[in-house]
């Protein structure tokens, strides 16, 4: 319930400032060059403001940096060595920005949006996975996520094993536009919406509440030409809860529609 309330507040924060503007009722459906956006625009002599329903998308791969094995995982490192090693080729990241508020003056563009982000992290050793387990020595009933070998649980044919997290966030960007070229830098604040662990053959999926940080902050930069571009994103906050690891994420990929 708290997540829902925070989400609604965040979305309102992104959209409500536009309600204070007197927009011209000018809806336009752009060509592919405008990435099929719907734009509502208000102009004055100095600043142009608009709301865009443009659906820019992000596709990339993510690696873990500054990996540590803290209290909850330190005892398992010898039994499951380097179990946080991930296969970057399969760490797929996808994001879609559903709506954004823009303010432009000359070549400078400020934007505030709402974005869904989906992150998959695939274990390099496909026999490794994580599962909830009752925490030992806890003063009250609680669970923690611990590593284990899938092969020890029954028949397993070595298919990929992964952990998954999805976020709803508010990205803020400062962009400089030069004709069809755009250079931008920004930050984002994101809330964790869902998380689970998954592997195939035998097919298995289980929620892993409490593994990932509930809040994620990131910095981002990118370059695009005619709406096709490259981006890099770094997670300032650790991906996991502090009791597990101080690992951060570094994501690189391509963008469409920025």
Residue locations for each model-derived region?
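Predominantly the C-terminal beta-signal and adjacent terminal strand-loop region
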Residues: 207-258
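Cleavable N-terminal export/targeting peptides
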Residues: 1-47
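Outer-envelope beta-barrel architecture signal
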Residues: 49-57, 106-112, 179-183, 215-219, ...
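Transmembrane beta-strands of outer-membrane beta-barrel pores
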Residues: 59-67, 116-122, 189-195, 227, ...
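Surface-exposed strand-loop-strand hairpins of Gram-negative outer-membrane beta-barrel proteins
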Residues: 63-95
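Flexible, surface-exposed loop regions and adjacent strand-edge segments
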Residues: 72-77, 123-137, 200-206
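Short sequence motifs at beta-strands and strand-loop junctions characteristic
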Residues: 86-92, 160-166, 211-215, 222, ...
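Short loop/turn motifs that connect adjacent beta-strands in outer-membrane beta-barrel proteins
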Residues: 22, 42-53, 66, 99-110, ...
